[in-house]
């Protein structure tokens, strides 16, 4: 390997341009795999490391796992063919010969909403034994500010004196900012943040990322500031979604349509529009809010009460969807018990195959408690089981003889649903639109019993 941390910038530039820089990405999931492919596509020999042997085997066999990430399928084919990218489960075979080690590992939370950093800590313990002096570690995983400086570095360094951050290895962060479903587009246009424990490491990371992504690289004074920016952007969104969710519930009660309000409000130049919905899911926003809260309670448990309130609101929205459904059944005169309910969309967001922390799950759990028969149709989850339910493979068949439909995810396929068509297939014509994609007047005209978050009665 090359001792990149000891090189001057001309040597580093030559190393990058020649394609001799050796890169490994530990964790090749939703973000890690596209990241690794981007590095390989830039001409750098890249190895993806993951503990999932099936994923690794499929990748090495040419099976691309992220069908909902446009553009990366072609890149995947090309870098495999050019032998610029491969995958392995054997971290011990790759890390010692790598110049740059990227960490793209999950940071979920436990039942008590405490962030779990066990994957990062476990890998860092391995890095202590495997890292060759002169290399650079880059943390792309989203962590709370201070975690890298206060915990991760000491794990990698250990107590034997072999490794010392800023002396014989570099460590920095470049938090990912991509939106699942459009990762390539985001990687090609969104600025990236770079923070490190020392200026030279920060400059080397900037030079490497500039070669790979050709976007603006924004220097941060340290790792914790870069991580704070990443969390701030996502917590901001979580809080604003909570605000419009509460507005939606208020407006329902006084006959104002939240969608009409928001569409008009966004004509004001400094209004950043957010939309109400069945809840906020995925591996980012809910987790990031709790990461920030976890940090705050170490300082002062009274700080960030607005974030806490936002989480309470957003986590209450699945119950509000059930309340709207119950209203619909009352209007229909039919008992909700033993009724057949179709969930449209299981993913936490439109047009991706991902059910992490999706609001569909608590909605389904509540329906089961009401003794409803639940069906699920999601174009990204056919011929499979999720939440203990075998998914429907055909939308028309799924709709037939249902008593109610709940739109949970605004997949493109659902935007074109005609209310009259829904009415013609259903036994009891109750529609709950939690994403504001159905024209409520068209729904009423078609004879549907319509309820929507923030839509009011018509």
Please report, for each region that a protein language model flagged, where it lies by residue.
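Structural/interface elements that position substrates and couple domains in central-metabolism enzymes
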Residues: 2-458
């Amino acid at each position: 390997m090359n001792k990149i941390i000891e090189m001057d910038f001309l040597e580093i530039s030559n190393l990058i341009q020649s394609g001799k820089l050796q890169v490994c990405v530990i964790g090749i999931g939703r973000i890690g795999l596209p990241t690794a492919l981007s590095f390989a596509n830039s001409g750098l020999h890249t190895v993806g490391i993951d503990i999932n042997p099936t994923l690794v085997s499929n990748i090495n066999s040419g099976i691309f796992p992220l069908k909902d990430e446009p553009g990366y399928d072609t890149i995947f084919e090309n870098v495999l063919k050019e032998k610029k990218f491969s995958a392995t489960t054997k971290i011990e075979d790759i890390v010692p010969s790598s110049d740059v080690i990227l960490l793209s590992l999950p940071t979920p939370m436990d039942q008590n909403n405490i962030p779990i950093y066990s994957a990062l800590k476990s890998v860092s313990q391995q890095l202590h034994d495997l890292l060759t002096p002169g290399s650079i570690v880059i943390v792309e995983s989203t962590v709370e500010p201070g975690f890298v400086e206060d915990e991760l570095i000491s794990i990698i360094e250990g107590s034997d004196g072999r490794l010392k951050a800023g002396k014989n290895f570099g460590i920095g962060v470049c938090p990912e900012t991509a939106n699942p479903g459009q990762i390539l587009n985001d990687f090609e246009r969104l600025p990236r943040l770079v923070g490190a424990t020392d200026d030279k490491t920060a400059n080397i990371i900037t030079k490497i990322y500039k070669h790979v992504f050709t976007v603006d690289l924004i220097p941060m004074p340290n790792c914790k500031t870069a991580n704070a920016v990443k969390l701030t952007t996502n917590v901001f969104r979580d809080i604003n979604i909570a605000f419009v969710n509460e507005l939606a519930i208020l407006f329902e009660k006084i006959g104002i349509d939240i969608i009409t309000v928001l569409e008009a409000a966004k004509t004001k130049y400094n209004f950043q529009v957010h939309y109400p919905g069945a809840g906020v899911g995925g591996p980012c926003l809910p987790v990031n809010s709790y990461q920030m809260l976890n940090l705050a309670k170490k300082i002062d448990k009274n700080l960030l009460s607005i974030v806490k309130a936002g989480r309470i609101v957003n986590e209450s929205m699945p119950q509000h969807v059930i309340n709207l459904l119950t209203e619909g059944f009352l209007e229909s005169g039919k008992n909700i018990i033993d009724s057949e309910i179709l969930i449209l969309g299981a993913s936490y967001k439109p047009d991706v195959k991902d059910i992490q922390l999706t609001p569909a799950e608590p909605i389904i759990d509540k329906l089961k408690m009401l003794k409803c028969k639940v069906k699920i149709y999601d174009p990204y989850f056919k011929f499979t089981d999720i939440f203990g339910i075998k998914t429907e493979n055909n939308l028309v068949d799924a709709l037939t003889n249902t008593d109610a439909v709940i739109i949970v995810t605004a997949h493109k396929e659902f935007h074109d649903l005609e209310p009259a068509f829904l009415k013609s297939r259903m036994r009891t014509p109750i529609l709950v639109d939690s994403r504001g994609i159905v024209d409520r007047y068209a729904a009423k005209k078609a004879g549907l019993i319509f309820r929507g978050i923030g839509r009011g009665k018509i």
